[in-house]
Amino acid sequence: KWDATEALKLIEQEKITNVTGVPTQSWEILSHPEREKYDISSLEDLGGGGAARPAEHVKQMDEQFEARPSIGYGLSETNALGTLNGGDEYLQYPSSCGRVVPPLTDINIIDENWNTLKEGEVGEVVIKSPGNMVGYWKNPEATAEVFNDDGWFKSGDLGYFDGPFLHIVDRVKDLVIRGGENISCIEVEAAIYEHSDVLEACIIGIPDERLGEQVASAVHLKAGVELSQEDIQKFLAGKIAAFKIPFEVRFFKDPLPKIASGKFDKPALREIFSND
């Protein structure tokens, strides 16, 4: 099981040069209250993948670590091949997961009818690569749902291109749809992370009789800090559209629940919000 303290010990003991995991793991190293006790000067790169890294975290990692942050995008079904972003370009485009990895990978943005969208238009990310899986084991129906006849794989992610840089908006299934408006959890989380007292933030949709869904946020603060729901809402005013500001904010004394990979456990959080 992931433990930031154990990670710091191992980095010091083994003179580790590269740490790659989901962005919450590198953030827990950065924000660890006893980080200065450990010699982690051997680190050269703090990689990330599997989830978005807020732009504010990229900035803080660059300021506080000699190691350069980097991030990639890919899926198990593509053998993790997709895009890479690191070095100075990552600092210039911190909300992007980077450029397509040449010459192995092609990435396109499509609508629901497999039509290619223009630069800047949001649609589903599809990937074609020799690294793509052949199919899901003994599940031809599921395989047929994600591949077209030309070998393009549907990722289940929404994104867009800004020049050569791919931006992931959200998982299709994780979008909050409030009164017909699609709200990116990643965008709202990134805005909350700009607050200096926030350690963790996770956005989910909760049922609403009138609007279908409302935006809700689970927040874990730095030790000794107290904030109210109104504090978070006021902080976000002007940073994101009013309809994207969380209707409900709950504060957790302990770190937010996560699955084995280190990603936030959104089903568990939805259950917590629905039961209280």
Name each model feature, range by range.
Residues 5-8, 27, 35-37, 144, ...:
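Short hydrophobic/charged patches on amphipathic alpha-helices used for structural packing
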Residues 11, 19-22, 113, 129, ...:
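AMP-binding/adenylate-forming catalytic core of the ANL superfamily
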Residues 52, 85, 92-138, 163:
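Adenylate-forming AMP-binding core of the ANL superfamily, especially NRPS adenylation
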Residues 109, 256-257:
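Hydrophobic beta-strand positions
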